[in-house]
Amino acid sequence: MKTFVSAVVLGFFLFSAAVHAATPSAQEREALFSELEKAEAIVEGAREARSTLYVFFDANCLYCNLTWRALQHYEKVGLRVHWVPVAYQKPDSVGRAAAILEARYRAAALKYNAVKYDAAKYEGGIQPLEKPKAETIEKVQANTRLMQRFGAPGTPALAWKDKEGQVHFKAGLPRLSELAGITGLPEQKIDDPELARFR
């Protein structure tokens, strides 16, 4: 099974190289966003959302972990985040994504992976599944392809609609000063020392 999962991840790397992060047109991005709204994801944040954000993430990604930490402050004031799991960083990224998706309480599993993240090893905190369900692997594959079709070379990658309904997309960890504009919410004070260099 480990060999199979490794082959899946290798396929993601090869696919990424082939796509070479082409930038879609505004019209194509609208169509991609419609697909994104239906993508398999872990929903976290406000029940009565004032703003909705979609984030592609790899469970082993350091900058995804930092993005999660930053967005917690905005979730407290009305942000809802759809965390869309992909797998490309490590052979066990598929297993970690599956561990979150197949958990009874997905949001709790996502939080555990983030809180227990090991920055020294670039590893998520959740134990990867050795035998993910085939349908789970297919969903993670589909998410990864969708992210690449948006033009993102890696994670994190954020997608959202502004108040006028225009689709926006950003690859990489946003600066803290950008988060108010991205979420459409008042700027939040973030004192996390690990995020200080991203102001």
Which residues fall in each region the model found?
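Thiol/selenol-based redox catalytic cores and closely related redox-interacting motifs
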Residues: 89-179
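Extracytoplasmic thiol/disulfide redox context detector
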Residues: 2-5, 10-90, 131-154, 172-199
